Each structure stands twice: as structure tokens, then as C-alpha cells.
């Protein structure tokens, strides 16, 4: 399954930094792990609950988490962006 353009744009919101949460995927610019957002959704929180609890997030950030996890489950190879020292580093596909 190929990524749609809007999904590609959403995935740009998911980054990782080895210095934050051991390199787990996070929402770009925030110390919020994708797994935290997915866990809260799985526990019954709504988008509105998350946006109220984390007012710095945007709806697209939550959607990006869902797209990211969907791609993992679908066994798609995705490459999150490495952000280190406030610089973006792209991983090379093997």
C-alpha cells in the first residue's frame, strides 16, 4: 500500500531523537511519545480529550500517530526523521 500525499505530510510530524525517550518516535517539537498518544486513545480518550489535555498539540499530530502505527502494523517500511541538536537528519533506506 502506497502512502497518500496527505499521509506523507502527516508522517513528517513524527520524529525521533536518541536523547529523548531512548529514540522512541515522538511528535515533532514535543516530548510526547507516539505510544503515549496511542495508549490514551486505546484507553478511551477522544481527540478532544487529548487536545484539551495537551493544548499545544494539533489534531494533525494525533492523526499522524495513527498513520504511523497503521504503517507499522501494515509492515510498511517507514523512516522517521532524526532530530538531533535541532537539526533534521534523514535516514538512508537500505
Predicted features along the sequence, with ranges:
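N-terminal first-folded block
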Residues: 1-31
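Long, charge-rich, low-complexity alpha-helical segments
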Residues: 33-94
Amino acid at each position: 500500500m502506497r502512502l497518500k500525499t496527505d499521509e506523507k505530510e502527516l508522517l513528517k510530524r513524527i520524529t525521533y531523537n536518541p536523547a529523548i525517550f531512548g529514540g522512541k518516535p515522538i511528535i515533532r517539537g514535543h516530548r510526547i511519545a507516539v505510544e503515549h498518544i496511542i495508549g490514551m486513545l486505546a484507553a478511551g480518550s477522544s481527540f478532544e480529550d487529548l487536545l484539551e489535555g495537551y493544548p499545544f498539540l494539533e489534531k494533525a499530530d494525533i492523526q499522524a500517530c495513527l498513520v504511523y502505527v497503521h504503517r507499522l502494523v501494515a509492515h510498511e517500511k517507514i523512516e522517521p526523521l532524526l532530530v538531533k541538536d535541532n537539526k533534521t537528519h534523514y535516514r538512508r533506506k537500505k
